[in-house]
Amino acid sequence: LSQHNPTAKIIVADPKPKFSKMALFQEGWNAHYAGMIDWIGSEFGGENVAVDPSAMTISIDGESINVDACNVIPAMKAGRIAALAGVTDGNWAPVNAADMSTKADADVYVLGDASQQGDMPKSGFSANSQAKVCANAVRGALTGSKIFPAKFANTCWSLINADDGVKVGATYKATDEKIAKVDGFISKTGETADI
């Protein structure tokens, strides 16, 4: 976009007060796309957004903005099937960290974004890690084989431009209450792209 339409503006209206790797993204946006990306969090109206497709406008906290394109991502929650199964509490399905079975029904397993599991972020890597723990537990229950203690990991790389990326990751363990973070790492602001 910066090459084909350098006067374009990207506006991110976010209902949350912060997001993962926020300082890293904002540093990268300023370095590579200065003045092009505006992030509007909940404190500044990001949770009060209306969309008018016929007029090609969005309204943020009552202020109307003309747009050429608009990508609306609604508030996230577990799929309807989880609610119909009766395993949700609010937007998510609370699970037991040892095997990803739901707290409402031990014979129903939920993992990934739909689960309310503790400290792990909602990411594909997290879902894959949770799936392995779940598969190990289900296999053990069905075959009587050893069930190994649940261990989880997550790593997320995000490209800010073709030559600049940031990372975050951690390891986790199952506790009686949740999936709990053991240790982690994250890129630091000010790092050069060659690190």
Name each model-derived stretch.
Residues 1, 125-133, 163-172:
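Short, electropositive alpha-helical surface patch
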Residues 138-195:
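C-terminal, flexible cofactor-proximal segment of oxidoreductases
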Residues 7, 105-106, 152:
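A structure-centric signal for secondary-structure junctions around beta-strands
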Residues 4, 63, 101-102, 150:
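Solvent-exposed alpha-helices and their adjacent loops that cap or buttress functional pockets
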Residues 28, 133, 137:
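Alpha-helical scaffold segments in soluble metabolic enzymes
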Residues 64-129, 140:
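FAD-site-proximal beta/loop scaffold in flavoenzymes
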Residues 2-91:
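A Rossmann-like FAD-binding core segment of flavoenzymes
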Residues 47-51, 100, 158:
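A structural signal for short hydrophobic beta-strand segments in well-ordered beta-sheet cores
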